[in-house]
Protein backbone atom coordinates (compact mmCIF):
# COMPACT_ATOMS: atom_id res chain seq x y z
CA UNK A 1 0.00 0.00 0.00
CA UNK A 2 1.22 3.49 -0.88
CA UNK A 3 -0.16 6.06 1.55
CA UNK A 4 0.00 9.67 0.38
CA UNK A 5 -0.98 12.64 2.51
CA UNK A 6 1.11 15.72 1.80
CA UNK A 7 1.17 19.23 0.37
CA UNK A 8 3.84 21.12 -1.53
CA UNK A 9 4.02 24.61 -3.00
CA UNK A 10 5.79 24.66 -6.38
CA UNK A 11 5.61 28.17 -7.81
CA UNK A 12 1.98 28.75 -8.73
CA UNK A 13 1.12 25.06 -8.29
CA UNK A 14 -0.16 23.95 -4.90
CA UNK A 15 0.19 20.17 -4.82
CA UNK A 16 -2.24 18.68 -2.32
CA UNK A 17 -2.60 14.90 -2.26
CA UNK A 18 -4.45 12.66 0.18
CA UNK A 19 -5.10 9.14 -1.12
CA UNK A 20 -4.04 5.51 -0.76
CA UNK A 21 -2.94 3.51 -3.79
CA UNK A 22 -2.69 -0.30 -4.09
CA UNK A 23 0.79 -1.79 -4.24
CA UNK A 24 -0.05 -3.90 -7.29
CA UNK A 25 -0.68 -3.55 -11.00
CA UNK A 26 -0.32 -0.36 -13.03
CA UNK A 27 -1.81 2.83 -11.63
CA UNK A 28 -2.00 5.58 -14.24
CA UNK A 29 -1.51 9.18 -13.09
CA UNK A 30 -3.54 11.12 -15.63
CA UNK A 31 -4.09 14.80 -16.30
CA UNK A 32 -3.24 17.68 -18.59
CA UNK A 33 0.22 19.26 -18.68
CA UNK A 34 0.79 21.21 -15.46
CA UNK A 35 -1.72 19.17 -13.45
CA UNK A 36 0.97 17.98 -11.01
CA UNK A 37 1.53 14.43 -12.27
CA UNK A 38 5.34 14.52 -12.42
CA UNK A 39 5.47 16.61 -9.23
CA UNK A 40 3.55 13.84 -7.46
CA UNK A 41 5.95 11.05 -8.40
CA UNK A 42 8.97 13.28 -7.74
CA UNK A 43 7.85 13.49 -4.11
CA UNK A 44 7.44 9.71 -3.95
CA UNK A 45 10.85 9.15 -5.55
CA UNK A 46 12.60 11.62 -3.25
CA UNK A 47 13.54 14.14 -5.94
CA UNK A 48 11.63 16.92 -4.15
CA UNK A 49 10.49 17.47 -0.57
CA UNK A 50 6.94 18.38 0.45
CA UNK A 51 6.51 21.07 3.10
CA UNK A 52 3.87 19.07 4.98
CA UNK A 53 2.63 15.52 5.33
CA UNK A 54 3.76 11.93 4.98
CA UNK A 55 4.50 9.29 2.36
CA UNK A 56 4.44 5.64 3.48
CA UNK A 57 5.23 2.64 1.25
CA UNK A 58 4.31 -0.82 2.55
CA UNK A 59 4.57 0.42 6.13
CA UNK A 60 7.95 2.15 5.61
CA UNK A 61 8.02 5.89 6.19
CA UNK A 62 9.61 7.61 3.20
CA UNK A 63 8.57 11.12 4.23
CA UNK A 64 7.37 12.62 7.49
CA UNK A 65 7.75 16.39 7.24
CA UNK A 66 6.82 17.04 10.87
CA UNK A 67 9.61 14.74 12.05
CA UNK A 68 11.99 15.98 9.34
CA UNK A 69 12.24 12.47 7.85
CA UNK A 70 13.14 12.50 4.16
CA UNK A 71 14.57 9.14 3.17
CA UNK A 72 17.21 9.61 0.43
CA UNK A 73 16.17 8.33 -3.03
CA UNK A 74 18.71 5.49 -2.96
CA UNK A 75 17.20 4.11 0.26
CA UNK A 76 13.56 4.21 -0.80
CA UNK A 77 13.60 1.08 -3.00
CA UNK A 78 11.75 3.05 -5.65
CA UNK A 79 12.76 2.76 -9.32
CA UNK A 80 12.37 5.68 -11.71
CA UNK A 81 12.11 5.65 -15.52
CA UNK A 82 12.25 9.15 -17.01
CA UNK A 83 10.94 10.49 -20.32
CA UNK A 84 14.48 10.29 -21.64
CA UNK A 85 16.27 7.05 -20.85
CA UNK A 86 19.30 8.66 -19.13
CA UNK A 87 21.63 5.77 -19.85
CA UNK A 88 25.36 6.00 -19.19
CA UNK A 89 26.87 6.67 -22.63
CA UNK A 90 30.26 5.12 -21.77
CA UNK A 91 28.72 1.78 -20.67
CA UNK A 92 27.40 -0.88 -22.98
CA UNK A 93 23.82 -2.03 -22.39
CA UNK A 94 25.00 -4.85 -20.11
CA UNK A 95 26.94 -2.36 -17.97
CA UNK A 96 23.94 -0.05 -17.75
CA UNK A 97 21.74 -2.93 -16.61
CA UNK A 98 24.22 -4.09 -14.00
CA UNK A 99 24.79 -0.61 -12.60
CA UNK A 100 23.01 -0.54 -9.25
CA UNK A 101 21.69 -4.09 -9.69
CA UNK A 102 20.59 -5.60 -6.39
CA UNK A 103 22.33 -8.80 -5.32
CA UNK A 104 18.91 -10.45 -5.01
CA UNK A 105 18.26 -9.80 -8.72
CA UNK A 106 21.37 -11.48 -10.15
CA UNK A 107 19.47 -14.71 -10.67
CA UNK A 108 16.70 -12.84 -12.51
CA UNK A 109 18.96 -10.92 -14.91
CA UNK A 110 18.29 -13.25 -17.85
CA UNK A 111 14.55 -13.29 -17.17
CA UNK A 112 14.29 -9.48 -17.15
CA UNK A 113 16.45 -9.23 -20.28
CA UNK A 114 14.23 -11.81 -22.00
CA UNK A 115 11.02 -10.15 -20.87
CA UNK A 116 12.09 -6.84 -22.40
CA UNK A 117 13.61 -8.39 -25.52
CA UNK A 118 16.99 -6.70 -25.05
CA UNK A 119 19.33 -9.71 -25.20
CA UNK A 120 20.53 -8.75 -28.73
CA UNK A 121 21.42 -5.29 -27.39
CA UNK A 122 23.67 -6.29 -24.47
CA UNK A 123 26.98 -5.49 -26.19
CA UNK A 124 25.87 -2.26 -27.85
CA UNK A 125 26.43 1.32 -26.67
CA UNK A 126 23.42 3.60 -26.02
CA UNK A 127 24.18 5.90 -28.99
CA UNK A 128 23.46 2.97 -31.35
CA UNK A 129 19.98 2.31 -29.89
CA UNK A 130 16.60 3.59 -31.03
CA UNK A 131 14.43 5.56 -28.61
CA UNK A 132 12.27 2.52 -27.88
CA UNK A 133 15.32 0.32 -27.27
CA UNK A 134 16.80 2.88 -24.87
CA UNK A 135 13.57 2.97 -22.87
CA UNK A 136 13.46 -0.82 -22.63
CA UNK A 137 17.01 -0.79 -21.26
CA UNK A 138 16.06 1.96 -18.80
CA UNK A 139 13.09 -0.09 -17.60
CA UNK A 140 15.30 -3.16 -17.21
CA UNK A 141 17.87 -1.20 -15.22
CA UNK A 142 15.16 0.10 -12.88
CA UNK A 143 13.68 -3.38 -12.36
CA UNK A 144 17.09 -4.89 -11.56
CA UNK A 145 17.43 -2.60 -8.53
CA UNK A 146 14.62 -4.72 -6.95
CA UNK A 147 12.26 -1.80 -6.34
CA UNK A 148 9.12 -2.10 -4.24
CA UNK A 149 7.58 0.48 -6.58
CA UNK A 150 8.41 1.58 -10.14
CA UNK A 151 7.74 5.17 -11.23
CA UNK A 152 7.42 5.84 -14.97
CA UNK A 153 7.21 9.46 -16.10
CA UNK A 154 5.64 9.47 -19.58
CA UNK A 155 8.12 6.92 -20.95
CA UNK A 156 6.58 7.12 -24.43
CA UNK A 157 6.35 10.92 -24.65
CA UNK A 158 9.61 11.43 -26.53
CA UNK A 159 9.02 8.57 -28.99
CA UNK A 160 7.51 8.76 -32.45
CA UNK A 161 4.46 6.63 -33.26
CA UNK A 162 6.35 3.56 -34.59
CA UNK A 163 8.56 3.48 -31.46
CA UNK A 164 5.53 3.84 -29.20
CA UNK A 165 3.93 0.87 -30.92
CA UNK A 166 7.19 -1.03 -30.46
CA UNK A 167 7.35 -0.37 -26.70
CA UNK A 168 3.69 -0.76 -25.70
CA UNK A 169 3.60 -4.59 -25.92
CA UNK A 170 6.59 -4.78 -23.55
CA UNK A 171 4.81 -2.53 -21.07
CA UNK A 172 1.75 -4.79 -21.31
CA UNK A 173 3.96 -7.80 -20.55
CA UNK A 174 5.35 -5.97 -17.52
CA UNK A 175 1.82 -5.56 -16.20
CA UNK A 176 1.23 -9.30 -16.48
CA UNK A 177 4.61 -10.86 -15.66
CA UNK A 178 6.37 -8.61 -13.13
CA UNK A 179 5.11 -8.43 -9.57
CA UNK A 180 6.21 -4.82 -9.12
CA UNK A 181 3.57 -2.09 -8.81
CA UNK A 182 3.95 0.74 -11.30
CA UNK A 183 2.88 4.38 -11.15
CA UNK A 184 2.60 5.42 -14.79
CA UNK A 185 2.35 9.14 -15.60
CA UNK A 186 0.59 9.92 -18.87
CA UNK A 187 -1.75 12.34 -20.59
CA UNK A 188 -2.48 9.82 -23.36
CA UNK A 189 -5.92 8.24 -23.21
CA UNK A 190 -4.80 5.39 -25.48
CA UNK A 191 -1.91 4.43 -23.15
CA UNK A 192 -4.20 4.42 -20.14
CA UNK A 193 -6.74 2.21 -21.89
CA UNK A 194 -4.08 -0.34 -22.82
CA UNK A 195 -2.09 -0.38 -19.60
CA UNK A 196 -3.89 0.86 -16.50
CA UNK A 197 -5.55 -1.18 -13.79
CA UNK A 198 -6.23 1.87 -11.61
CA UNK A 199 -6.40 5.56 -12.51
CA UNK A 200 -5.65 8.74 -10.58
CA UNK A 201 -7.06 11.85 -12.27
CA UNK A 202 -5.23 15.06 -11.35
CA UNK A 203 -6.07 18.67 -12.05
CA UNK A 204 -4.41 21.84 -10.68
CA UNK A 205 -2.36 19.87 -8.16
CA UNK A 206 -5.29 17.99 -6.66
CA UNK A 207 -6.60 14.44 -7.03
CA UNK A 208 -10.02 14.59 -8.67
CA UNK A 209 -10.74 10.86 -8.87
CA UNK A 210 -9.18 7.53 -7.89
CA UNK A 211 -10.37 4.03 -8.72
CA UNK A 212 -10.33 1.12 -11.13
CA UNK A 213 -10.13 2.04 -14.81
CA UNK A 214 -13.67 0.86 -15.51
CA UNK A 215 -15.06 2.83 -12.55
CA UNK A 216 -13.23 6.09 -13.33
CA UNK A 217 -13.98 5.79 -17.05
CA UNK A 218 -17.70 5.53 -16.30
CA UNK A 219 -17.66 8.51 -13.91
CA UNK A 220 -17.79 12.22 -14.72
CA UNK A 221 -14.10 12.70 -13.80
CA UNK A 222 -12.84 12.08 -17.34
CA UNK A 223 -15.70 13.83 -19.13
CA UNK A 224 -13.67 17.04 -19.80
CA UNK A 225 -11.09 14.91 -21.66
CA UNK A 226 -13.70 12.85 -23.49
CA UNK A 227 -15.79 15.72 -24.87
CA UNK A 228 -14.05 15.54 -28.25
CA UNK A 229 -14.30 11.76 -28.39
CA UNK A 230 -17.26 9.52 -28.89
CA UNK A 231 -18.32 8.29 -25.44
CA UNK A 232 -17.59 4.65 -24.71
CA UNK A 233 -17.66 2.05 -21.97
CA UNK A 234 -14.81 -0.02 -20.56
CA UNK A 235 -15.97 -3.39 -19.19
CA UNK A 236 -14.15 -6.32 -17.61
CA UNK A 237 -15.10 -9.73 -18.95
CA UNK A 238 -13.80 -13.29 -18.95
CA UNK A 239 -13.83 -16.06 -21.55
CA UNK A 240 -16.53 -18.69 -21.04
CA UNK A 241 -15.83 -20.78 -24.12
CA UNK A 242 -16.08 -21.00 -27.90
CA UNK A 243 -19.04 -21.86 -30.13
CA UNK A 244 -18.82 -25.42 -31.44
CA UNK A 245 -20.18 -24.45 -34.86
CA UNK A 246 -19.51 -20.77 -35.50
CA UNK A 247 -16.30 -18.74 -35.12
CA UNK A 248 -17.57 -17.00 -32.01
CA UNK A 249 -16.36 -16.70 -28.41
CA UNK A 250 -18.63 -16.29 -25.39
CA UNK A 251 -17.62 -13.78 -22.71
CA UNK A 252 -19.02 -13.49 -19.20
CA UNK A 253 -20.20 -9.97 -18.43
CA UNK A 254 -21.42 -10.27 -14.87
CA UNK A 255 -24.04 -13.01 -15.03
CA UNK A 256 -24.75 -12.36 -18.70
CA UNK A 257 -23.19 -13.69 -21.89
CA UNK A 258 -21.65 -11.61 -24.66
CA UNK A 259 -20.78 -13.09 -28.06
CA UNK A 260 -17.82 -11.75 -30.08
CA UNK A 261 -15.76 -12.94 -33.04
CA UNK A 262 -13.57 -15.91 -32.12
CA UNK A 263 -10.63 -15.02 -29.87
CA UNK A 264 -7.35 -16.83 -29.41
CA UNK A 265 -7.90 -17.00 -25.65
CA UNK A 266 -8.32 -19.83 -23.19
CA UNK A 267 -11.36 -20.35 -21.02
CA UNK A 268 -11.07 -18.29 -17.84
CA UNK A 269 -8.87 -15.57 -19.33
CA UNK A 270 -9.92 -12.06 -18.33
CA UNK A 271 -9.80 -9.02 -20.58
CA UNK A 272 -11.16 -5.53 -20.99
CA UNK A 273 -13.51 -4.60 -23.80
CA UNK A 274 -14.48 -1.20 -25.11
CA UNK A 275 -17.94 -0.50 -26.49
CA UNK A 276 -18.69 2.80 -28.22
CA UNK A 277 -21.92 4.39 -27.05
CA UNK A 278 -23.07 4.82 -30.66
CA UNK A 279 -22.89 1.03 -31.07
CA UNK A 280 -25.53 0.52 -28.37
CA UNK A 281 -29.23 0.92 -29.17
CA UNK A 282 -32.11 0.50 -26.73
CA UNK A 283 -35.46 -1.28 -26.88
CA UNK A 284 -38.30 -1.79 -24.41
CA UNK A 285 -38.78 -5.40 -25.52
CA UNK A 286 -36.26 -7.90 -26.93
CA UNK A 287 -36.75 -8.31 -30.69
CA UNK A 288 -37.91 -11.76 -31.75
CA UNK A 289 -35.59 -11.92 -34.76
CA UNK A 290 -32.44 -9.84 -35.16
CA UNK A 291 -28.98 -10.07 -36.68
CA UNK A 292 -27.58 -8.53 -33.49
CA UNK A 293 -26.22 -11.32 -31.29
CA UNK A 294 -25.98 -9.36 -28.05
CA UNK A 295 -29.26 -8.14 -26.59
CA UNK A 296 -28.90 -7.75 -22.82
CA UNK A 297 -31.27 -6.55 -20.09
CA UNK A 298 -29.93 -3.38 -18.41
CA UNK A 299 -31.22 -0.79 -15.95
CA UNK A 300 -31.25 2.94 -16.72
CA UNK A 301 -29.15 4.90 -14.20
CA UNK A 302 -29.28 8.40 -15.70
CA UNK A 303 -29.80 10.34 -18.91
CA UNK A 304 -27.52 13.25 -19.82
CA UNK A 305 -28.23 15.81 -22.55
CA UNK A 306 -24.98 16.43 -24.45
CA UNK A 307 -24.77 18.61 -27.59
CA UNK A 308 -28.18 17.65 -28.93
CA UNK A 309 -27.74 13.96 -28.08
CA UNK A 310 -28.65 11.91 -25.01
CA UNK A 311 -26.06 9.78 -23.23
CA UNK A 312 -27.75 7.02 -21.24
CA UNK A 313 -25.84 5.38 -18.39
CA UNK A 314 -26.92 1.76 -17.95
CA UNK A 315 -26.23 -0.65 -15.11
CA UNK A 316 -25.17 -4.11 -16.24
CA UNK A 317 -24.36 -6.12 -13.14
CA UNK A 318 -21.87 -4.02 -11.17
CA UNK A 319 -20.51 -2.30 -14.28
CA UNK A 320 -21.69 0.58 -16.46
CA UNK A 321 -22.59 0.70 -20.13
CA UNK A 322 -23.19 3.93 -22.07
CA UNK A 323 -25.60 4.33 -24.99
CA UNK A 324 -25.93 7.45 -27.15
CA UNK A 325 -29.41 8.05 -28.57
CA UNK A 326 -31.47 10.99 -29.82
CA UNK A 327 -33.83 13.05 -27.63
CA UNK A 328 -36.67 11.73 -29.81
CA UNK A 329 -35.74 8.13 -28.96
CA UNK A 330 -35.48 8.96 -25.26
CA UNK A 331 -38.91 10.58 -25.24
CA UNK A 332 -40.53 7.84 -27.32
CA UNK A 333 -39.12 5.13 -25.01
CA UNK A 334 -40.02 7.19 -21.94
CA UNK A 335 -36.64 6.51 -20.37
CA UNK A 336 -36.20 7.28 -16.70
CA UNK A 337 -33.82 6.11 -13.92
CA UNK A 338 -34.65 2.67 -12.57
CA UNK A 339 -36.33 1.51 -15.78
CA UNK A 340 -35.33 -1.85 -17.31
CA UNK A 341 -34.63 -1.88 -21.05
CA UNK A 342 -32.71 -4.03 -23.54
CA UNK A 343 -29.32 -2.94 -24.85
CA UNK A 344 -28.48 -4.09 -28.38
CA UNK A 345 -24.69 -4.13 -28.77
CA UNK A 346 -23.47 -4.00 -32.35
CA UNK A 347 -19.68 -3.88 -31.98
CA UNK A 348 -16.97 -4.61 -29.39
CA UNK A 349 -13.24 -3.79 -29.36
CA UNK A 350 -10.53 -5.10 -27.05
CA UNK A 351 -8.03 -3.28 -24.85
CA UNK A 352 -5.97 -5.74 -22.84
CA UNK A 353 -5.96 -9.45 -22.19
CA UNK A 354 -4.75 -11.01 -18.96
CA UNK A 355 -4.33 -14.51 -17.62
CA UNK A 356 -6.98 -16.73 -16.05
CA UNK A 357 -9.33 -15.16 -13.55
CA UNK A 358 -8.44 -16.37 -10.03
CA UNK A 359 -11.00 -18.42 -8.16
From Swiss-Prot:
Q: Does the keyword Zinc-finger apply?
A: no
Q: What Gene3D superfamilies does this protein's entry cite?
A: 2.40.50.100, P-loop containing nucleotide triphosphate hydrolases
Q: What PROSITE patterns does this protein map onto?
A: ABC_TRANSPORTER_1, ABC_TRANSPORTER_2, MODC, MOP
Primary location group = membrane
One Pfam match, by short name?
ABC_tran
Residue ranges of domain ABC transporter in the record:
1-229
Q: Which domain of life is it from?
A: Bacteria
Annotated localization? Cell inner membrane
Q: What is its EC number?
A: 7.3.2.5
Q: Where is the Mop domain?
A: 289-354
Catalytic activity of the protein:
molybdate(out) + ATP + H2O = molybdate(in) + ADP + phosphate + H(+)
* Binding residues for ATP: 31-38
The membrane topology of this protein is: Peripheral membrane protein
GO molecular function annotations of the record = ABC-type molybdate transporter activity; ATP binding; ATP hydrolysis activity
Cellular component (GO) terms are: plasma membrane
Alphabetically list the UniProt keywords.
ATP-binding, Cell inner membrane, Cell membrane, Membrane, Molybdenum, Nucleotide-binding, Translocase, Transport
Instruction: Indicate yes or no for the key word Nucleotide-binding.
Output: yes
Record-stated family: Belongs to the ABC transporter superfamily. Molybdate importer (TC 3.A.1.8) family.
> Its biological function?
Part of the ABC transporter complex ModABC involved in molybdenum import. Responsible for energy coupling to the transport system.
Q: How does it assemble?
A: The complex is composed of two ATP-binding proteins (ModC), two transmembrane proteins (ModB) and a solute-binding protein (ModA).
Protein name in UniProt: Molybdenum import ATP-binding protein ModC
Amino acid sequence: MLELNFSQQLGDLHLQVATDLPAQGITAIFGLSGAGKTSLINVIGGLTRPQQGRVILNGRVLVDAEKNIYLPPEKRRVGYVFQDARLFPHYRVRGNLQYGMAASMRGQFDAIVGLLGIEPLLNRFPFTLSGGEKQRVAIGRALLTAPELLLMDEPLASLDLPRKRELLPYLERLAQDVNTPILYVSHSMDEILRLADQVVVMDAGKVRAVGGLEEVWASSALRPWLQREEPSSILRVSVIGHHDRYAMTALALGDQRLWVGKLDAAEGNSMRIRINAADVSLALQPPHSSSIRNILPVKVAECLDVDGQVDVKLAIGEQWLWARITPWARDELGLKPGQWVYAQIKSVSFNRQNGPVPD
